[in-house]
């Protein structure tokens, strides 16, 4: 259920249910100092309220997973199917984000339970998945790292991709040939990322190094 301010009212306790991962939004980058005084570059992630919206089982759905939902929608933006599916989780009018984490079913998990930020702890090694920044249409030099031609005055080409054909046989462009095209805006996964700090009161998670995507990008963290 949601109150007059649009904030979610959860039915679970303060701790919530712990899963093998969670979802958070990228806020930006910063740096913190380690125990030995070293400066550690970190990405700041903010976790909102996520509620369990469905428990998928291998017998019924073909695989085990916990479906989660967050950020309530307005009634005008929701379909009847969405309202019916998420009503049991406490969303009267659907949710902007509906995601899932594949894992074994935790004991005692119920619809409407809040996901605990303690699902991820300091020192954990996680797999980070998010949507990379979209760069628009890009040439082969920027998109694939082609060397390009000489930068001399006498050169007739500089950043052109060059010949893409072949000989008489096969007489066609082979599948997978690298061409100019849309760069970015694709799902990227970074593995072996260390969790530097977790601040439960603020809903903040600090992970070492950069995370793909722009600010406010939804990020999935799963324990390795």
Question: For the regions a protein language model found, what residue spans apply to each?
Answer:
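Extended basic (Lys/Arg/His-rich) segments that typically form rRNA-contacting surfaces
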Residues: 2-224
């Amino acid at each position: 259920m949601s109150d007059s301010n649009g904030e979610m009212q959860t039915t679970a306790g303060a701790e919530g249910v712990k899963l093998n991962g969670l979802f958070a939004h990228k806020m930006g980058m910063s740096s913190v100092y380690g125990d030995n005084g070293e400066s550690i570059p970190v990405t700041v992630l903010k976790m909102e309220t996520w509620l369990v919206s469905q428990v998928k089982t291998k017998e019924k759905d073909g695989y085990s997973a916990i479906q989660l939902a967050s950020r309530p929608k307005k009634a005008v933006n929701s379909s009847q199917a969405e309202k019916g599916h998420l009503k049991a989780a406490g969303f009267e009018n659907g949710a902007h984000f509906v995601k899932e984490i594949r894992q074994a079913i935790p004991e005692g998990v119920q619809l409407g339970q809040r996901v605990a930020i303690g699902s991820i702890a300091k020192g954990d090694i996680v797999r980070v998945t998010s949507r990379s920044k979209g760069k628009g249409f890009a040439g082969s030099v920027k998109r694939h790292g082609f060397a390009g031609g000489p930068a001399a005055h006498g050169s007739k080409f500089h950043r052109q991709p060059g010949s893409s054909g072949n000989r008489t046989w096969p007489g066609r462009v082979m599948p997978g040939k690298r061409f100019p095209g849309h760069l970015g805006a694709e799902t990227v996964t970074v593995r072996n990322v260390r969790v530097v700090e977790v601040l439960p009161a603020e809903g903040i998670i600090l992970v070492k190094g950069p995370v793909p995507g722009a600010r406010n990008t939804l990020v999935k963290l799963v324990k390795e």
